[in-house]
Regions:
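Long, contiguous internal "core" modules enriched in hydrophobic/ aromatic residues
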Residues: 207-220, 228, 235, 241
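Core segments of transmembrane alpha-helices
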Residues: 61-73, 219-234
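Active-site recognition of the HExxH zinc-binding catalytic motif
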Residues: 108-117, 154-155
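Cytosolic/stromal cytosol-facing helical appendages immediately following the last transmembrane segment
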Residues: 1-53, 123-214, 242, 253-424
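Transmembrane helix interruption/hinge and helix-loop junction motifs
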Residues: 81-87, 235-243
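Membrane-embedded alpha-helical segments that form the functional core of polytopic membrane enzymes
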Residues: 69-107, 134-142, 251-252, 317-329
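Auxiliary, metal-adjacent structural segments of Zn-dependent hydrolase domains
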Residues: 15-102
Length: 424
């Protein structure tokens, strides 16, 4: 049941409203759910296990990713050999690369959810899918190592956003820290992933986890797969297109695609300086990152026409490109993944909506609309010492007496608890 106390909270840089509600009368609501990343689902929440996919559903989802990879190389070869003007070749080539990046990172996030047990009920099939179907084609971290680094450390309430969290270490390696100058923040925000050292580190990491540090059976299977693939590509005469439209996107472009969303994924380097209950602090480090701006339904005549053009251009030139290139699949609702890691990515937007304003040990949900708001929140936190963008600290202080019966039991530390169980 919804509780006014747990209604969604917004930052000072946002619109102060649920922007998605302004889209509710537009046609084709599933499309707007995809564009914005936010659902208007008003049904009761489902149990996480009720959101899992059937094997055929997961493999249908994966198969269209393989189709994109295959067609990108085939059509890319034809494009390179065509007599089209250079500008058109560049435009079409960029679109192909964008789609390959989308599916490469789609594979990564499908692997991510499958590792969490949030794709298939059959765990043996899930492990097989992670190893042979999802990770080898993109040279992703082997499953067992990923469980250690991501599930046991990044998701643990004890190590999340600490020096033991590999995702925080990644931000530190890219030059971010609490107390940095604003000029350094903006410079690194834009340029960090293009630094040659960072690119080489990324390539070395992908090679090491696949062919050096991985278990022997992983190294052998990956070496055989890639030897066969490269041999087939070379023999068929598609090597140039394969390098440009497959290898370049998955090894280079994906870095910037990932970077755009990763920098605002959490409130990096934040510490529990105000003594919040542990799960409330954990929940305060993530927020819904949706794409859009209010639909101008309140305007009329010429004012509406001008506002509608501006709104439409924002959808076409900002929201859809960001959704395709960087915020694919579940990423707008990544905050809810940390609250309910067992919910499948196909259902995460509707389930997040179903859980909004419901009492939770993680506190009220929070959200932003647009990348610029995310960047300003991160700047304020890292450069200006303003580390409570949604007012969660004041919210807790004002409502502590009422919250205590609901949250204290869940927020008490548990002794002798394995890290793998200390997750959200």
């Amino acid at each position: 049941m919804q509780d006014e106390l747990f209604k969604t909270r917004y930052s000072k840089y946002g619109y102060g409203i649920d922007v998605r509600r302004t889209y509710k009368d537009l046609p084709c609501q599933p499309f707007w759910t995809w564009v914005t990343g936010k659902s208007l689902n008003d049904r009761p929440p489902r149990r996480p296990k009720d959101t899992l996919l059937k094997p055929w559903q997961l493999y249908l989802h994966i198969s269209w990713g393989y189709a994109v990879f295959f067609l990108a190389v085939i059509y890319g070869q034809q494009l390179l050999a065509s007599q089209q003007p250079l500008w058109l070749k560049c435009l079409l080539g960029a679109l192909i690369m964008c789609l390959v990046v989308n599916r490469q990172r789609g594979f990564l996030h499908t692997f991510h959810y499958t590792t969490h047990g949030a794709s298939l009920e059959n765990k043996a099939l899930a492990r097989f899918t992670c190893k042979w179907i999802l990770s080898i084609p993109i040279l992703h971290t082997p499953r067992d190592e990923y469980v250690k680094l991501h599930v046991n450390e990044h998701h643990s309430v004890r190590t999340f956003n600490t020096e033991h969290d590999v995702d925080l270490v990644f931000m530190k390696q890219h030059g971010f820290y609490k107390g940095m100058s604003e000029s350094a923040f903006w410079t690194r925000l834009v340029l960090a992933p293009f630094h040659p050292a960072r690119i080489l580190e990324h390539l070395k990491f992908r090679f090491d986890v696949s062919f050096v540090s991985a278990p022997r059976h992983e190294r052998v299977s990956r070496a055989l797969y890639w030897a066969a693939l490269l041999g087939l590509v070379y023999a068929s005469g598609y090597l140039e297109a394969f390098a440009l439209f497959y290898l370049f996107p998955i090894f280079i472009l994906t870095q910037y695609s990932s970077w755009i969303q990763h920098v605002s994924e959490h409130l990096w380097f934040a510490r529990n300086e105000h003594g919040l209950p542990r799960f409330l602090h954990y929940g305060s480090l993530s927020w819904g990152r949706f794409l859009g701006r209010p639909y101008p339904a309140d305007k009329q005549g010429l004012a509406f026409a001008l506002a509608f053009v501006r709104w439409s251009l924002g959808v076409l030139l900002i929201d859809i490109p960001l959704r395709v290139f960087s915020f694919m699949q579940d990423l707008p609702s990544h905050d809810f993944h940390h609250r309910k890691p067992g919910v499948n990515f196909w259902r995460i937007a509707p389930e997040r909506a179903a859980n909004e304003a419901r009492p939770s040990k993680f506190g009220p949900m929070t959200e932003t609309w647009g990348m610029w708001e995310n960047f300003l929140i991160l700047r304020d936190h890292l450069c200006r010492g303003q580390s409570d963008p949604f007012g969660i600290v004041d919210w807790y202080r004002e409502n502590h007496a009422r919250l205590a019966p609901e949250t204290d039991a869940a927020n008490q530390p548990r002794t002798n608890q394995p890290a793998s169980q200390a997750t959200a």
